[in-house]
Amino acid sequence: MVDINLECVHQIEPKTRSAGQQQQERGLKEAYLEAVRILLVLLENILAQPENSMFRTIRQENKAIKEKLLSLPGCERLLEAIGFVRAPSSNAYTLPTEVSLQQVKKYRDALSERRTAWLNGTVSKSPPQQSTTSTTPLFIKPSVEYRHRIAFPRVLRTNNNFLQSLELYSDAVMQYEDNLLLATGRTLIPVEELTEMASEKLIDIQDQIASGERQEKEPCVRDLLLVELVNWFNTQFFQWVNNIPCRVCGSEESRLRRTEREGDIRVEVTVCCGQESKFYRYNDISQLLVSRKGRCGEYANCFTFLCRALDYDARIVHSHFDHVWTEVYSEAQMRWLHVDPSENVIDSPLMYQHGWKRHIDYILAYSRDDIQDVTWRYTNDHQKILHLRKLCGEKEMVQTLDAIRAKRRQNCTADRKLFLSQRNMYEVIGLTLERKPTENELKGRSSGSLSWRQSRGEHTFTNIFVFNLSATELQKRQLNVRYSCATDTYERYAKEGEHITILDSYKTWQKAQFSSKNIFRKVERDWKMAYLARLEDTDCGEIAWTFDFSKTNLKVKSYNLVFETKTFGDGKISVTVDATDGSASVENATGFKIVAKLTGGKGDVAWQHTQLFRQSLNSRDYPFDLQVQLH
């Protein structure tokens, strides 16, 4: 299944002008129609002859291309969305062969449909908008080329391949310290939004502590910001890829034919429908910030860099069982926090041994001024692990770490060296301790410990959001709101016939709820599905939305509610819609409340037997859609 960015398609369309600017609007419409005509011709040529490299290139030297197509506002972003790439020193856009032909066809169809609507005068002047994260740049230029950023003199004098790899991994993290890249990384993170969410969670936790509901120590806002950062990164910024979709059928079940190298990049070549597709396994952060896709290695690499962009002391962690994640130092807790960005997990280090049943032997963490053998944090059977470590002697390991550590710290100040030495000492003491795994670590769950769930607002969360009428809704005597679990976005809209105008949007399911208890959004990466469910190990989950029109003279005339649910086995979901002003019926009430309760189910996955708004991640439908008429 191939999805397209409709916002990019709509962004190039003319904007509605005031009555005195009708002539200017006609000119904009003509420019739009001509630009789309040219682009449609280009896309048709690619679809007709996909192997012809000439048709895959858009050159700026062409006068029509430059003056009629590329001059249209939003065109460059649309080309990028389709899959075109422009090198920094080139005057041409090229469409790589790994871009799916099905994707090109979908953009062609969407553009053709919108152009026809503009020609016939049947277009909605305010097409539905998609909520997106920050715009993906076509190219990011670092201060120094990747291979020079990771090139350092070797200090190890050993023939042991495993120990040599430790120095290579240590050199690789130095690519994060490029000032231009760090500045670019900061611009890609919605820092204000994430900080606001973290602050709201902190206030909620403070209230829980004050009421006696919570006994744990109050967390700091930087730790809560980290929780929001990894959730945003996992659900909105980065995309998991098993295989690049087939260019013919769009399937991701293609077969690996071979692995090859193009320069410094490892490339997986897969085949389906007789066509080869290439999956580039980028290590260069400047390329990952553009592609924003990969597997656990790319996830950890990019996320660790973004932590550095926000000035966290972060390090990338490589395990010998072929998994990669991040550790971030918490100044407030004075310890390193385990963060797995590909799993959206925080502070569950024993889950690999006990939940995933992985054999632990070597796990190393690398940062700009340190290297640490953190194997002992990820196991609670140290004696057994010692007998499994056969790749080098323990004394040789310590000597290697000391040599690499000295290499990384040679430019550190005396104060920094002292701080790092003291921190290392405390960490080593902590690593010697063994503890019992939590329930979540035993089951390998991705929701983290209860403490972190509360910090994420996923235990009990009262947002106190109430839907009141805006000026437009008051004038039109209607309130319409819908929610997409695929994009995790609410939209308020006005409706006239079949024409819809988006009035406002709210990102994340929590943003427009009144309250919830034991509810979280589950994303199934393997099945490409998303839904709201109750937390694991809870008997009941509840979520509510509130609508209040009491400050106006209007009451509910009628309403229509689409509210999709899915149950399995003994799972039960009850949905009630009740007036909030004491009225017997919602009709003629000045407000009402929608409440969904999730209960039942059997076994360890009982929580999964009750689901709200389940849909494909590629779906553009709205499994929650409320339309209220007022009088």
From Swiss-Prot:
* Reactions that this protein is recorded to catalyse: Hydrolysis of an N(4)-(acetyl-beta-D-glucosaminyl)asparagine residue in which the glucosamine residue may be further glycosylated, to yield a (substituted) N-acetyl-beta-D-glucosaminylamine and a peptide containing an aspartate residue
Annotated positions of the Phosphoserine modification? S126
SMART domains reported for this sequence: PAW (SM00613), PUG (SM00580), TGc (SM00460)
Which residues are catalytic? C296, H323, D340
Q: Which residues take part in binding Zn(2+)? A: C246, C249, C272, C273
One GO CC annotation, please? cytoplasm
Q: What's the family?
A: Belongs to the transglutaminase-like superfamily. PNGase family.
Q: What is this protein called?
A: Peptide-N(4)-(N-acetyl-beta-glucosaminyl)asparagine amidase
Point out the gene that encodes the protein. Pngl
